[in-house]
Amino acid sequence: MAESHLQSSLITASQFFEIWLHFDADGSGYLEGKELQNLIQELQQARKKAGLELSPEMKTFVDQYGQRDDGKIGIVELAHVLPTEENFLLLFRCQQLKSCEEFMKTWRKYDTDHSGFIETEELKNFLKDLLEKANKTVDDTKLAEYTDLMLKLFDSNNDGKLELTEMARLLPVQENFLLKFQGIKMCGKEFNKAFELYDQDGNGYIDENELDALLKDLCEKNKQDLDINNITTYKKNIMALSDGGKLYRTDLALILCAGDN
């Protein structure tokens, strides 16, 4: 099935979903190593079998990743390589998803109750707004299809809603700074202890200066994951979640807390 889709001149949203599932064998949300090489090999074979040339985007992709063992792409990158239907592709090209800071601000707009999740109806409104900003409108049936596909693509724990880290897979890999924090997340007890330590005035939130101190310490302790030279970027992206410069416990937990235990 993936072969016939890779031979198409236009790939629908549902076909794109099937292609992604075919190659993302471990369900990580990214293609890397053998998965990525399988995609490149099957793409070249499928196009050749159908007597089709690789598109310029495909050629660039193959040249960039074909000889690399350390390549890694997300859904966004694949959507730009394959001839995906225009309105679905626009969801990956919108301004709100070109930088992590803009993405965080958009997340804050839709996670209005600070629950740490965006549920189905909120996701539908989010996608509708993205398309409207690109001067595109789709009917309710198509919007529902896109919403359902986004949940299937990103909802890794199948709870019917998206966490920040799941939603962040809409970002290009190089823009997704949350990946840097995946390996250093704390359990709930450790996180609460850290929050109280850096909330130096005990007012229930962390301001920019307190966050700066926390990030510096995290960078010192986790040099393999975090680069102290990128503190300004980390801080700017995290503060985009704040409420008027006040970063509350639930907001910071989205970045640094792995769970309740």
From Swiss-Prot:
Ranges for domain EF-hand: 11-46, 53-88, 98-133, 142-177, 186-221
Annotated stretches, region: Interaction with RANBP9: 2-7
Residues carrying N-acetylalanine: 2
GO biological process: cochlea development; locomotory behavior; long-term memory; metanephric collecting duct development; metanephric connecting tubule development; metanephric distal convoluted tubule development; metanephric part of ureteric bud development; regulation of synaptic plasticity
List of residues binding Ca(2+) 2: 111, 113, 115, 122
Record's keyword terms, sorted: Acetylation, Calcium, Metal-binding, Repeat, Vitamin D
List of residues binding Ca(2+) 4: 199, 201, 203, 205, 210
Keyword Repeat: yes
Positions contributing to Ca(2+) 3 binding: 155, 157, 159, 161, 166
Domain notes: This protein has four functional calcium-binding sites; potential sites II and VI have lost affinity for calcium.
Role noted for this protein: Buffers cytosolic calcium. May stimulate a membrane Ca(2+)-ATPase and a 3',5'-cyclic nucleotide phosphodiesterase.
Family named by the database record: Belongs to the calbindin family.
Protein name, as recorded: Calbindin
Species: Homo sapiens
